[in-house]
Amino acid sequence: WPAWPRGPIQAVIHSRVDRGDYTVEKVYFSSLAGHYVTGSLYRPKADRPTSKRRPGILCPHGHWPEGRFYDAGTDKAAEQLKRGAEMFEAGARYPLQARMVQLARMGCVVFHYDMVGYADSRALPHRSGFGDVGAVLRLQNLMGLQTFNSIRALDFLESLPDVDRKRIAVTGASGGGTQTFMLCALDTRPSVAFPAVMVSTGMQGGCVCENCCFLRTGINNITIAALFAPRPMALSGANDWTIDIETKGLPELKAVYGFYGKADLIDAKCYPRFGHNYNQVSRELMYSWMNRHLKLGGKEPIRERDFKPIVPGDLKVFDVEHPQPRDAMTLEQYRVFQTRLIEGQYAKLLSGARKGLKEYRRVVGSAARVLLAGTPSTGYSASGIARGKLSGGGTFETGTVTRTGLGHAIPWTLLTPAKGPGPSLVAWFDGLGKAALFDEQGKPIPAVRRLLDAGHSVLSADVYLTGELTRDGKPVTRVDTHGSFVGYTYGYNLPPLTHRIRDVLTVVSAFTTKLSAAVNGGQGGRIGVHLVGTGGAGTWVVLARAVMSRGRASRGVTIADVGGFSFSKITRRDDPMLLPGALKYGGLGGLAALAAPSVLVLGGTEGVPKSELSPLRRIYDVADGELSIKAGSISADSVAFMILGR
């Protein structure tokens, strides 16, 4: 996000093999400038020339050894024949080719394309190259590239003169099943889908090509597959993680399809006597599904026929006469290309902001809702509340607050002036937690006391991994992540920074509602909220304000000391401040700019790169917002002075 540019396909189709009732051709085309998709194109061969367009089927393969070139060998083939998984030796030894051949014989144009790092697609590796912090901060990953390749494979299929664009289907197994339902969730062109032995409530995908940051936080593959509704989709299961698909997954999918009155257009069948597979038994289930929903007119039941396979060496796309293009990028070149691409996209957003902020807020704001978990609240509950009097005047309350649907409790403290709640709330967060607002005797620090005496309520909390939510009360400097690929961690779990921002939003929203009712008696609108972040909490607070503002000026000032922090300084995958995608959207300043035109004082910026501050200045200038950027740190006394001076 935003989408990558889709340039000319420039497809090369060569070396036609005629098998009598179908043909096979070799294909490569440009997915991105300097990155190529390779594969085999299967076409039905008509008895006589026809102008009739045929259904097109896209077939991604999974993690079979050598992918499109897969040869099970004689021993495994014999085992498959013995177990009844296959009827013919050719299908048992070359099950991927068997699928393409049968679909072509049924009247479909079939494109069987390579995953990155398999068969002819060897310019980039499959399981490495995107695990470093730089890739994480820019959301560069193999999942994104392969999904884009699938979109481009659809572009290629649609470009063929003999393909009916209204009858496009996708089917693949295992990792190819992942590519199938991911593509079908994102692209509206496929009309039929059959992801085999992948969709389940269990394991969600074990390869880096099936995972990326933020992909499955709070959801699973059932949810993603449901995005295809109400178009026809069928699933197959086996004696693997998909074994329960008929009872765990299918009922939920039928419920979603039922919203459209189309529960009959989703189905699943498990064959528990077979291990992980896309064997003839499962393939014939798929053939029937395609026959019915692509309106192929075949006589049921459809049985796969024997065929003459092409030896893997003869499937190779690149040869002496058709060498790999000279501009094919290496991994290092691709990474540079990708970085320049996203930098160019962001620069275009900044440049366009001179004419208005609508597009900037649409693109970066949409990203921020994912990165910063800025979803609307659905309610709150408080518990363990204790009350008492403050030395020097006023009262305190302590307790925990829980956001509906999240479960974890956030410890908080609310200090109220002697005369009761006033028209504004100071929500002050610190890296040490709420304890930072009190001295060693448990009294409010002088800055907090001045705010109370001036009629401001003061709120603080121990957000994620701070204060009471740590083992020893000390700041957490390292968090556990997967050793080589954080997509396995942050694809399912929110980063600590995002948790902290969401906790800030939860606490502020809950008490803004509570105090607004207390001050206004339920009438006259909400109170003003000043947000303060010190002691390492400045980044959490300014990004929380970015989520809260939504293009509107807040009724309070935001004072955030970032302590020299910038996302470009992060070097470790276990850094609790690591936010995947941050540098793709302008870093600290690019995301914080969403707070405009709310009044913002950003301190502790000494050492923060210009590249992460200039977007903030640019957007605030266009929004005509009040922005003050200070190199030095912001003291507690300065916080009180700035709030009381307004």
What are these model-predicted stretches?
Residues 78-80, 85-89, 93-100, 105, ...:
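Accessory cap/linker subdomain of secreted extracellular hydrolases
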Residues 87-94, 134-148, 170-181, 211-224, ...:
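Alpha-helix capping and helix-loop boundary segments enriched in small/acidic/polar residues
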Residues 1-36, 47, 52, 236-424, ...:
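Alpha/beta-hydrolase-fold serine-hydrolase catalytic core, especially in secreted/extracellular enzymes
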Residues 79, 165-167, 264:
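Short acidic capping loops at alpha-helix termini that bridge into adjacent secondary structure
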Residues 48-154, 158-159, 198-211, 421-514, ...:
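Cap/lid segment of the alpha/beta-hydrolase catalytic domain
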Residues 155-217, 507-594:
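Primarily recognizes the serine-hydrolase "nucleophile elbow" in alpha/beta-hydrolase
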Residues 56-59, 110-112, 169, 192-195, ...:
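Structural recognition of the beta-strand scaffold that forms the well-ordered cores
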Residues 171-176, 180-196, 202-210, 214, ...:
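Catalytic-domain carbohydrate-binding cleft regions of carbohydrate-active enzymes
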